[in-house]
């Protein structure tokens, strides 16, 4: 058995051998993932040290020394002087190791009353708050661009499709307004999820509290949480569950991203030729000189698969009884991969939406006579013919339904709220304006 092992194992007992291969398996890439959470962990350690001083477990001088060293560690991590690597089991170990190295016994006091369990809970919670804030902002931005395009192009006719078959006359404005409302909903969902997870787990330790009068309300305020997560068992049950909720909010946005990317992929084909993409959103072929491929849109479309995979991984991890289990370590990789990929794709969408160009002549040419048949059936019903009879009449004359009709007259006639003649843009703008920017502490990076 190879007993060579990493130093700085917080849980190691003297005289107990550790198999290096087992330790490598246990740690996996955990410390590398902790680079995402490290500054949040330092922030939480600052609040915890203050809480310890408030109950007399640290002197004022000890607190000052700890806060100074935590700030130094944060600065060194930001500027690259301190590298969080595999000499440490995880980010928590790195923080305690640094404090002990610099402050001796004072540094060894930092872990009083806390566990790595509530450490990662609070660091992840702070990280998720910032990611959900970013998600909500991106959803608002996407909706904003879509609303602008809806207003500008509400009178531009285009085919409306069902089953990928031409159905009725629609408008570019209606297409845009549909995405605007969808991303307003996505912004609300992100904000609601942020409100759900905005609670402080620090001080719940390993899931059963500690025999100390920890000032948890103080750390709640210091860390910018809206409320305390009261029960330690509930705090442990929330690990994975809150990450899952956050990924579901992200997935709501990337699901719409996938569908709008699908539309754009179709509309850029020679067979449709409805839109022209900015050149930087396409690539070429390594063998076919004539090709311009919408690779950016295709990878946007694929993004939802990454988010869904992360969500599925966490769902499977949560087949556990109550309390902490090491399985949950794997939830970190899932949320990091899901959010990093999802947000990166969503960040590209506002500029794309503002710059793509419709081709009005092709849109109009794709509107065929049969697309007026529904209008004809409803007009006959208005004249007193039972709708089912009017439907049959219109079906027989669908090929000639365009007589005395234009795309513009069809659009003007569609007056039901939300339809082409009444997009209700003011209603959507009012909803958009209710999307207050979610509050979160600034990203420490």
Curated annotation (Swiss-Prot):
Pfam families: Lyase_1 (PF00206). Keywords: Amino-acid biosynthesis, Arginine biosynthesis, Cytoplasm, Lyase. GO terms for cellular component: cytosol. It catalyses: 2-(N(omega)-L-arginino)succinate = fumarate + L-arginine. GO terms for molecular function: argininosuccinate lyase activity. Its EC number is 4.3.2.1. It is an enzyme of class 4 (lyase). Pathway: Amino-acid biosynthesis; L-arginine biosynthesis; L-arginine from L-ornithine and carbamoyl phosphate: step 3/3. Its main location: cytoplasm. It is found in: Cytoplasm. Transmembrane segments: none annotated. InterPro entries: Argininosuccinate_lyase (IPR009049), Fumarase/histidase_N (IPR024083), Fumarate_lyase_CS (IPR020557), Fumarate_lyase_fam (IPR000362), Fumarate_lyase_N (IPR022761), L-Aspartase-like (IPR008948). One of its GO terms (biological process) is arginine biosynthetic process via ornithine. Belongs to the lyase 1 family. Argininosuccinate lyase subfamily. NCBIfam families: argH. This is Argininosuccinate lyase.
């Amino acid at each position: 058995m190879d007993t060579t092992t990493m130093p700085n194992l917080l849980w190691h007992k003297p005289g107990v051998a550790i198999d290096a291969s087992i330790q490598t398996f246990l740690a996996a890439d955990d410390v590398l993932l902790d680079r995402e959470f490290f500054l949040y962990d330092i922030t939480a350690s600052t609040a915890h040290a203050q809480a310890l001083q408030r109950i007399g477990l640290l002197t004022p001088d000890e607190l000052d020394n700890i806060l100074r060293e935590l700030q130094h560690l944060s600065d060194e991590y930001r500027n690259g002087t301190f590298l969080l690597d595999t000499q440490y089991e995880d980010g928590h170990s790195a923080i305690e190791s640094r404090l002990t190295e610099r402050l001796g016994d004072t540094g060894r006091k930092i872990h009083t009353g806390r566990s790595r369990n509530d450490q990662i809970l609070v660091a992840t919670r702070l990280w998720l708050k910032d990611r959900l804030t970013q998600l909500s902002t991106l959803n608002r931005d996407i909706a904003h661009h879509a609303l602008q395009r809806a207003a500008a192009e509400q009178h531009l006719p285009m085919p409306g499709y069902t089953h990928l078959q031409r159905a009725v006359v629609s408008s570019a404005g209606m297409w845009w307004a549909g995405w605007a409302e969808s991303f307003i909903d996505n912004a609300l969902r992100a904000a609601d999820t942020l409100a759900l997870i905005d609670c402080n787990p620090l001080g719940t330790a390993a899931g059963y509290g500690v025999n100390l009068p920890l000032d948890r309300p103080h750390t709640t305020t210091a860390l910018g949480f809206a409320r305390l997560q009261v029960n330690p068992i509930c705090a442990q049950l929330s690990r994975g569950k809150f990450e899952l909720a956050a990924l579901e909010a992200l997935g709501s946005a990337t699901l719409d991203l996938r569908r709008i990317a699908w539309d754009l992929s179709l509309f850029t084909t020679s067979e449709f030729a409805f839109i022209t993409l900015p050149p930087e959103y396409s690539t070429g072929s390594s063998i076919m000189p004539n090709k311009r491929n919408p690779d950016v849109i295709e990878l946007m479309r694929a993004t939802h698969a990454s988010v869904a995979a992360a969500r599925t991984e966490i769902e499977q991890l949560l087949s556990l009884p109550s309390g902490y289990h090491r399985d949950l370590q794997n939830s970190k990789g899932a949320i990091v991969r899901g959010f990093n990929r999802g947000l990166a794709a969503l960040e590209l969408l506002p500029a794309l939406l503002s710059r793509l160009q419709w081709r009005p002549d092709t849109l109009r040419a794709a509107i065929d006579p049969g697309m007026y048949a529904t209008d004809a059936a409803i007009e006959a019903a208005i004249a007193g013919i039972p709708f089912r009879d009017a439907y049959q009449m219109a079906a027989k004359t669908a090929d000639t339904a365009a007589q005395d009709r234009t795309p513009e007259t069809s659009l003007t006639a569609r007056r039901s709220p939300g339809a082409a003649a009444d997009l209700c843009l003011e209603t959507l703008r009012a909803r958009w304006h209710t999307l207050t920017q979610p509050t979160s502490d600034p990203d420490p990076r």
